[in-house]
């Protein structure tokens, strides 16, 4: 068992009151119970019986994270360890400092020395999530929560919120994994292509600067509620920084020109949303894995950010080389990506508003009028293809849920994004929701347009900033306050990284195609370092690297990436 330093965090912050007398051990007929806050945390007659019976009824499936909330004395946990599959893991979570000390003093030694147990004391949800991601058995397939004692009831909100956030974390990992499988080699291909594009046009490389925007930000999603907020966007355009998602551009232009547009999509269909639409004064915030032709079609100053959908070896090498731009959490939603960028770019205390992040719909279209998905639906309508096909009216998994004012329709992916929103924004102040419809986003404050105007006016008056943050414009070369040029040797480091990748692929190809016997350890090492060759394989993470079937599939990918990396420019301008 491993556990971090308990530090000086005060558990009173969880309950909002002052800790009372320290917990007191009381002997019973079967082990000890604990008296704390005038409550017995176990039975005062037979302390261990109830927990041992509960453990005997548990059926722990493989690859399960067992979350034990408030373990206190650890009753029943040793028996639980004997029933857990080797691929499962036990996380003991405690948010009361006095109970944590009690656990460390009286927990069974078998529990202390177990390799599949981790004990964590914290009062912060983010620390819980970071710990889960670092566990040796991660990724898990499900989570099982158990109450380790009666102290669970005293901190129920914290433990329930921890469980929900861990569940969202696990779901996000597998959704991203499925996305990688469905997108095939696009993820790695787009990253390499965008790097090569930067080498071919070094003067167009821009990096985002955290905490650089000091005016209120408005994030515009493409949800149906944007239609009701469009007039507000037009009225406040000159006093806010308007950050729009890719598919919402057509719903705003031409009268409302955003300050920046976020591009996340790696598939080809997003290209049509940018053809001939964006003025040159708009900045493009593009994911490093975004579709390269869409970046070129936008034809505006591009600032790359990065979404690490997988912890691949080639990504770690890029990070070590210092060529990975500003990174955000892989949520899978362009609206959530825009929200994370806004949180990273705003200065301290600057308010953020958002509209169109509904994660649901009611009547009519699933997106705002004029947005790219609605335009695509109109363009595909013929005498034989209805404007409302069955797949649009009744998508797979559709269900009716409680909204802010009335019932709304949603699907599992959108509900997951709503949960991810709550996780990402739980600890960020000054975040406001302008929409009066859609799923309830409990971690943000819903405000009217009049209230938003007051907040924006107060912020602009206090900071004396009412103009768009553009520093210099000359000969179509635009410099933004939120961007900076990279280091002088940035292009050299990118070229060295890509050249090294190409050399490793050439060596692997030679060893797989030569008639002479090759060193299997070298082949295995080359395949492991070039994991982008098989990231999209369903069995990629647990593949046997020297199986004939696997090697044939890897060999089929080699020529594609070698051809792509042959575009590396021989010299830099």
From Swiss-Prot:
Pfam families: MptE-like (PF01973). This is Uncharacterized protein TP_0930.
């Amino acid at each position: 068992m491993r556990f971090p330093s308990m530090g000086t965090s005060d558990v009173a912050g969880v309950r909002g009151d002052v800790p009372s007398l320290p917990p007191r051990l009381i002997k019973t007929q079967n082990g000890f119970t604990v008296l704390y806050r005038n409550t017995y945390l176990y039975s005062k007659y037979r302390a261990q019986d109830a927990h041992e019976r509960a453990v005997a009824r548990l059926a722990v499936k493989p690859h399960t994270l067992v979350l034990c909330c408030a373990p206190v004395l650890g009753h029943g946990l040793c028996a639980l360890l004997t029933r857990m599959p080797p691929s499962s893991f036990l996380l003991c979570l405690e948010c009361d400092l006095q109970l944590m000390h009690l656990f460390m003093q009286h927990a069974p030694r078998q529990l202390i020395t177990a390799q599949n147990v981790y004990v964590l004391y914290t009062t912060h949800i983010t620390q819980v999530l970071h710990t889960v991601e670092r566990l040796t058995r991660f990724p898990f397939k499900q989570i099982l929560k158990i109450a380790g004692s009666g102290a669970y009831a005293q901190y129920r909100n914290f433990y329930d919120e921890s469980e929900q956030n861990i569940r969202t974390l696990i779901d996000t990992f597998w959704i991203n994994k499925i996305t990688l499988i469905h997108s095939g080699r696009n993820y790695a291909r787009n990253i390499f292509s965008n790097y090569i594009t930067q080498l071919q046009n070094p003067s167009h490389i821009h990096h985002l600067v955290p905490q650089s925007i000091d005016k209120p930000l408005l994030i515009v999603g493409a949800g149906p509620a944007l239609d009701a907020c469009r007039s507000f966007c037009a009225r406040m355009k000159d006093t806010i920084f308007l950050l729009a998602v890719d598919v919402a551009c057509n719903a705003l232009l031409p009268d409302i020109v955003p300050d920046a547009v976020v591009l996340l999509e790696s598939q080809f269909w997003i290209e049509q949303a940018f053809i001939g639409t964006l003025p040159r004064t708009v900045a493009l915030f593009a994911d490093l894995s975004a579709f390269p032709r869409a970046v070129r079609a936008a034809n505006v100053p591009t600032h790359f950010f990065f979404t690490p959908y997988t912890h691949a070896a080639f990504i770690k090498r890029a990070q070590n080389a210092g060529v990975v731009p500003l990174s955000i959490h892989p949520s899978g939603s362009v609206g959530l990506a825009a929200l994370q960028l806004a949180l990273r770019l705003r200065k301290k205390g600057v308010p953020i508003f958002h509209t169109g992040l509904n994660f649901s719909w009611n009547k009519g279209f699933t997106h705002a009028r004029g947005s790219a998905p609605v335009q695509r639906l109109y363009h595909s309508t013929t005498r034989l293809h209805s404007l409302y096909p069955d797949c649009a009216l009744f998508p797979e998994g559709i269900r009716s849920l409680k909204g802010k004012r009335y019932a709304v329709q949603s699907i599992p992916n959108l509900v997951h994004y709503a949960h991810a929103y709550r996780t990402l924004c739980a600890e960020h102040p000054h975040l406001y929701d302008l929409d009066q419809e859609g799923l309830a986003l409990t971690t943000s404050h819903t405000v009217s347009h009049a209230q938003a105007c007051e907040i924006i006016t107060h912020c602009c008056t206090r900071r004396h900033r009412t103009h768009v943050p553009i520093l210099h414009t000359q000969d179509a070369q635009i410099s933004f306050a939120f961007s900076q040029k990279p280091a002088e040797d940035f292009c050299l480091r990118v070229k060295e990284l890509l050249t090294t990748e190409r050399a490793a692929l050439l060596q692997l190809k030679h060893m797989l195609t030569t008639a002479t016997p090759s060193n299997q350890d070298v082949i295995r090492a080359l395949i492991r370092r070039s994991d982008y060759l098989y990231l999209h394989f369903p069995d990629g993470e647990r593949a046997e690297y020297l199986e004939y079937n696997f090697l044939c599939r890897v060999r089929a990918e080699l020529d594609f990436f070698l051809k792509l990396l042959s575009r590396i420019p021989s010299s830099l301008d």
